[in-house]
Amino acid sequence: MYDILQPELWVKIIDYSGEINLLLTDKNFFELFNLIDTKVDVVEYIVKNNLIDALKYFILLKKLRHPIMEKNIVTIKSLNKCLIKSCKKNKLNIIKYLVSLGADIKAGDDCAVQLASQNGHLEVIEYLVAQGANIRADNDYAVIWASRNGYLDIVKYLVSQGADIRANNDYAVRWASRNGHLKVVKYLVSLGANIRTENDYAIKYASENGYLRIVEYLVSQGADIRADNDYAVGLASSNGHFEVVEYLVSQGANIRVDNDYAVRLASSNGHLEVVKYLVSLRANIRARCDFAIKWSSSNGHLEVVKYLVSQGADIRSQNDYAVRYASTNGHLEVVKYLVGQGADIRTGDDYAVRWASRGGCLEVVKYLVDQGANIRAKDDYAVKWASEKGHLEIVKFLISQGAVLTKN
């Protein structure tokens, strides 16, 4: 293949493409390295692509002081960088070779063993430890991240090597709980991890993320479900984790704290099943000036909006906030429903049509105009901002309806 073009043409092709993989296909191409302008670190590229034979050849040229090495300098710093990346990517054969060339496994505060632990590469960790890596560097980063990412075998190995599972205020068990790694959580607790640190962080965030089995286990170990003003049930509701909410309530969680935070956030995020359940427990859907209906409307959750209205929510609260922000965010079906329930689209100097225009919501704008919205309110705010934001179709429509677009 090399012979089909002149070397200078190959150089131009490689410089134009920025790709050096062709240079690694045979020795003839490899000789072109000194002629190209690419800034690619050759060693790093070779390691990234797991080309150990190419790496060995490259190092051989260095030992022979081949002219090509005048441009491609191999330093300990570059070897260390490649070692760390190889540990992250589980390239044990290249790791061993880099170490044989002088790469420092402890470079960057033992970054290599930390990243191998974080990414679940047990054999790499064992090799690095055999070479003297410090698993406790950076406040036991290795065991913390192995726990956080659910690598039980690595956690056990690091513990056998002296890792402190309670480092950084029991970070390991807190994040294993938050990320849903039950086996890791149980193992850490069996070794004395404190599940109640940071104001019961573990159960709060396990609840927030919907890990029912972990929540149940933490409760069995003495976690306080009501910590931090019933944060657990509030965040479980906010994220729609019905089973977790139901369980926390069965354990005594108070759904009404913080001005009915639970039902407000469940409504805001569109979790109808949770909303209905909380209402069945006497949650106040009208708390905080009808926050629930306002934000479910603003976020476009039509079924939640309908349910809240059926339960007595005031769609006109705070100067028709619901229809104004449903319009602003382009939720046409919600806007139509609210209008059908008596919402006033013209409140706030025709806020709804002005901000629907500004936000580029053409269908909402058309509907509001059809319902009698004044597109010229606030000195033709609607067309000015539609123009400013680049919404050409809205500008055309508004002008066709009598809006006046003036030059500043």
Swiss-Prot record:
SUPFAM superfamilies: Ankyrin repeat. Signal peptide: none annotated. Pfam families: Ank (PF00023), Ank_2 (PF12796), Ank_4 (PF13637). The keyword Protein biosynthesis does not apply. The keyword S-adenosyl-L-methionine does not apply. ANK repeats lie at residues 78-107, 108-137, 139-167, 168-197, 198-227, 229-257, 259-287, 288-317, 318-347, 349-377, 378-407. Keywords: ANK repeat, Repeat. InterPro entries: Ankyrin_rpt (IPR002110), Ankyrin_rpt-contain_sf (IPR036770). This is Putative ankyrin repeat protein L483. It comes from Acanthamoeba polyphaga mimivirus.
